From Swiss-Prot:
Organism (species): Nitrosomonas europaea (strain ATCC 19718 / CIP 103999 / KCTC 2705 / NBRC 14298)
Official protein name in the record: Phosphoserine aminotransferase
Keyword Cytoplasm listed: yes
Membrane-spanning segments: none
Cofactor mode of binding and number, as noted: Binds 1 pyridoxal phosphate per subunit.
The organism's taxonomic lineage, starting at the top: Bacteria, Pseudomonadati, Pseudomonadota, Betaproteobacteria, Nitrosomonadales
Presence of keyword Transferase: yes
InterPro entries given in the database record: Aminotrans_V_dom (IPR000192), Pser_aminoTfrase (IPR022278), PyrdxlP-dep_Trfase (IPR015424), PyrdxlP-dep_Trfase_major (IPR015421), PyrdxlP-dep_Trfase_small (IPR015422)
Function of the molecule: Catalyzes the reversible conversion of 3-phosphohydroxypyruvate to phosphoserine and of 3-hydroxy-2-oxo-4-phosphonooxybutanoate to phosphohydroxythreonine.
GO biological process, one term: pyridoxine biosynthetic process
């Protein structure tokens, strides 16, 4: 058993059971005599790994048959460009919801390919909330609406799925696109409500190097923008079962192990309850304390990333140093906001959060 609890925002902690299985299979996967790292991506051994990973994901998330699952490279940041390149089509315009730094990065990239309207924003309150759906303004001619379901830096999370039919007027069938990189598979979600979902793997489902895309098949018929390279066309990868080029094979293998681990935990409903309990422990401590502070609106607080500050920033270094001595690492907040951040993704055990909360109480007692 490892002696530390890793609260990194990503790449993040993986289930210990998964790492142990990967270690056992490192030199010889299922009697093949090969490591997964050495396998041909078109060989029967790896093809079975890829198929089983996709099947497990479809089962866990309830992905309908008319959606394609793509295993791609380039991380979620590549999707900031691929989404507009593939979905803008002749409309040339898209709506984006701005709830923080990752939303802003997606918006900035999309502007290279077409017109972007900000459908809603929480900038006025410092990105400490989620804009209510009633405040969204959907363009009648937008090709899609994009939002980030969880902002890892600001600790803001959508606790609901936007129902665009309620606010889109005549454009009620507009596709909803979601960057789910940091809360993917942390709770049940209805895939049929989305046109496209993308998620970098390195927070909740695997190691860095893999991005998962779930796309409704009809959207693959939209002609990509002129000059879009084959590698940046969703249809290229859908038509070739994510094997157009060599995919990130080992990352897909680890993701498959994580899918099986999630199933053993009871699936997404069970993991959601665990995530709620973990987040509640930290937020409850913060809310009764005058020593710790979280600026995020309570209804919009992230279950995955808990940002907090100390009443005296001069104690930050001492907090981090003493936390590390207690086996609690990677708690430093993002450089753009400072303070602390505890990322408590699916694989973070309840015991890790309990240990953190105990340390926070002790630190407050000694320094308040």
């Amino acid at each position: 058993m490892r002696k530390i609890y890793n609260f990194s925002a990503g790449p993040a902690v993986l289930p210990e059971e998964v790492l142990e299985q990967a270690r056992e299979e490192m030199l010889d996967w299922h009697g093949s005599g090969m490591s997964v790292m050495e396998m041909s991506h078109r060989g029967k051994e790896f093809m079975s790994i890829a198929d089983e990973t996709e099947s497990a994901l479809r089962e866990l998330a309830g992905i309908p048959d008319h959606y394609k699952v793509l295993f791609l490279q380039g991380g979620a940041s590549s999707q900031f460009a691929m989404v507009p390149m593939n979905l803008l089509g002749k409309k040339g315009k898209a709506d984006y919801v701005n709830t923080g730094q990752w939303s802003a990065k997606a918006i900035s990239e999309a502007k290279n390919y077409g017109s972007v309207q900000i459908a809603a924003s929480s900038e006025s309150d410092g990105f400490n909330s989620v804009p209510p759906l009633a405040q969204w303004h959907i363009s009648p001619d937008a090709a899609y609406v994009h939002y980030a379901s969880n902002e890892t830096i600001g600790g803001v999370e959508f606790q609901w799925t936007p129902d665009l039919s309620a606010v889109a007027g005549d454009n009620k069938n507009i596709p909803l696109v979601a960057d789910m990189s940091s809360n993917f598979l942390s709770r049940p979600f209805d895939v049929s409500k989305f046109g496209l979902i993308y998620a970098g793997a390195q927070k909740n489902v695997g190691p860095a190097g893999l991005v998962v895309v779930i796309v409704r098949e009809d959207l693959l018929d939209i002609p990509p923008l002129a000059g879009t390279p084959a590698m940046f066309r969703y249809k290229t990868h859908a038509d070739n079962a994510s094997m157009y080029n060599t995919p990130p094979t080992y990352a897909i293998y680890i993701m498959g192990l994580v899918m099986e681990w999630l199933k053993k935990q009871g699936g997404l409903t069970a993991i959601e309850q665990r995530n709620i309990a973990k987040a509640k422990l930290i937020y409850d401590l913060i809310d009764v304390s005058s020593f710790y502070h979280c600026p995020v609106n309570q209804a919009d607080r992230s279950r995955m990333n808990v940002p907090f500050t100390l009443s005296d920033p001069g104690l930050d270094d001492a907090f981090l140093k003493q936390a590390q001595a207690h086996g609690l690492i990677q708690l430093k907040g993002h450089r753009s906001v400072g303070g602390m951040r505890a990322s408590i993704y699916n694989a973070m055990p309840l015991e890790g959060v309990q240990t953190l909360v105990t340390f926070m109480r002790e630190f407050e007692k000694n320094h308040a």
